């Protein structure tokens, strides 16, 4: 290991991929565990005489969760750009260029975060009114969001540092930092919400404290610890050639995920119109439960992106293809197991988070439909990592944006015929389409790459 990086172009493929993916998956599962635990605490805010307090609070958290999803998607611009640009520079043995890319992506993250905070803080009320929730739920959500804006610049920087470390093959560092932050958040939530009697907004304060803590860990490691890439500068006057490359790599993924978040905001609005706050709660809380497969797939996708970036630059694309095959096998096994649990035990699983009869019934309907299509979702996300690694981020963006956008008119139509369940079926139908088309498209792209370079290095 040199300059805090790891060479992914040598060694056994599966073990190398697993060592890279496990910390990423660990971070994802810790994030999922925290989110579900936070929702579980919120789900217990109600009383026997007023159980609606819990479901209304969950709806408020759900609305905020969608905006945080959009926030993460915006932050992906710098994160993905740095991950691929740094990874490819390292694979090509051009360390100075990797350092320059790290400085540029960090500068982008700082500027983006300031703009985003100003937008969310200033327009919190009209943004959250979009979901058509009751006035008291919207008011709670507005205060919650404004508290969270304190931590967003630090969250953007942490995402950026995560991309840099992933590109350098050091995914264990973000895992440790995020794990520490999540553990702190888990401890703070019940203390702030119940012991200090801050209720729903105690969760927001806990999140702010945890994000500041995670950033401080990254800052220490970059400046005084591993000093990755020679202690690169955080804020510079950007040069067009590097800025363009990062934007080229990061923008499609960022736009894709941002549009995905916006589309889900529209779906939540439709669910709220046809199912009230219970409909929105079922979608947003159910989506967090569904994160067991989403986060696992995203972890492997990110690992593949870093793995393939280095091997593609080193003319060892066949190593990346083999890693993809291994990952698909893992996804298939996990997808079947999760689908069975969602289909057969949806109500019981949902009841762990919100132990209220109406909430359990609504949640079970959502998980049943989603359980039918988990494998297709995992195939799509895994294949995205392959495209990102070879620097072709546009293809998965086109497919994802197209079929996710089709969810809105389909949801309006099906909801008018079937009620709120029609929204779930609109999501499921588009998921199947993406899970079939994207891997097929990659197979075509891979054959073209092989024709251009018929004798790649095996490694």
Identify the meaning behind each predicted range.
Residues 58-118, 155-174, 280-340, 344-345, ...:
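Small-residue-rich hydrophobic transmembrane alpha-helices
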Residues 19-38, 147, 158, 181, ...:
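Transmembrane helical elements of multi-pass membrane transporters/channels
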Residues 46-66, 136-143, 241-246, 276-277, ...:
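Periplasmic/extracellular loop-to-transmembrane helix junction in inner-membrane transport proteins
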Residues 29, 33-58, 128-135, 191-198, ...:
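Helix-terminus/linker motif at the lipid-water interface of multi-pass membrane proteins
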Residues 79, 83, 147-166, 174-182, ...:
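Short runs within selected transmembrane alpha-helices of multi-pass transporters and secretion channels
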Residues 31, 35-38, 42, 72-79, ...:
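Alpha-helical transmembrane segments and their lipid-water interface positions
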Residues 8-40, 44-48, 66-81, 85, ...:
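N-terminal transmembrane alpha-helices
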Residues 1-21, 86-151, 195-251, 308-373, ...:
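Short alpha-helical transmembrane segments in multi-pass integral membrane proteins
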């Amino acid at each position: 290991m040199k300059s805090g990086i790891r060479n992914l172009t040598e060694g056994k493929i599966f073990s190398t991929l697993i060592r890279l993916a496990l910390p990423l998956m660990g971070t994802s599962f810790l994030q999922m565990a925290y989110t579900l635990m936070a929702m579980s605490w919120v789900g217990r805010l109600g009383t026997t005489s007023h159980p609606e307090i819990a479901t209304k609070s969950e709806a408020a958290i759900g609305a905020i969760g969608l905006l945080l999803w959009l926030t993460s998607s915006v932050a992906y611009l710098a994160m993905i750009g740095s991950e691929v640009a740094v990874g490819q520079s390292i694979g090509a043995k051009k360390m100075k260029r990797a350092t320059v890319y790290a400085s540029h992506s960090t500068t982008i993250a700082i500027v983006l975060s300031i703009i985003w905070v100003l937008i969310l803080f200033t327009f919190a009320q009209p943004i959250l009114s979009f979901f058509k929730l009751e006035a008291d739920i919207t008011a709670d959500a507005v205060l919650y969001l404004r508290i969270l804006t304190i931590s967003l610049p630090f969250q953007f920087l942490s995402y950026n540092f995560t991309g840099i470390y992933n590109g350098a093959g050091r995914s264990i560092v973000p895992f440790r930092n995020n794990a520490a932050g999540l553990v702190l958040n888990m401890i703070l939530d019940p203390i702030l919400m119940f012991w200090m009697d801050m209720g729903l907004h105690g969760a927001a304060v806990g999140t702010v404290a945890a994000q500041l803590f995670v950033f401080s860990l990254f800052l220490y490691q970059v400046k005084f610890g591993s000093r990755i890439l020679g202690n690169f500068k955080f804020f510079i006057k950007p040069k067009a050639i590097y800025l363009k490359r990062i934007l080229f790599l990061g923008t499609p993924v960022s736009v894709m995920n941002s549009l995905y978040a916006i589309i889900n905001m529209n779906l939540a609005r439709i669910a709220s119109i046809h199912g009230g706050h219970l409909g929105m709660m079922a979608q947003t809380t159910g989506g967090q439960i569904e994160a067991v497969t989403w986060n696992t797939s995203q972890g492997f996708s990110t690992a593949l992106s870093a793995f393939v970036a280095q091997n593609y630059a080193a003319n060892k694309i066949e190593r990346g293809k083999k890693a993809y095959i291994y990952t698909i096998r893992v996804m298939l096994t996990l997808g079947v197991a999760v689908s069975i649990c969602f289909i057969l035990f949806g109500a019981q699983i949902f009841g762990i988070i919100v132990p209220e009869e109406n909430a359990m019934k609504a949640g079970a309907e959502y998980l049943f439909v989603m359980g039918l299509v988990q494998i297709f979702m995992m195939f799509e996300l895994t294949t995205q990592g392959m495209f990102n690694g070879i620097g072709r981020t546009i293809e998965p963006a086109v497919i994802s944006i197209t079929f996710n956008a089709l969810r809105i008119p389909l949801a309006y139509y099906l909801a008018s015929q079937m009620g709120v369940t029609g929204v779930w079926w609109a999501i499921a139908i588009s998921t199947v389409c993406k899970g079939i088309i994207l891997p097929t498209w990659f197979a075509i792209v891979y054959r073209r790459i092989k024709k251009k370079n018929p004798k790649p290095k095996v490694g």
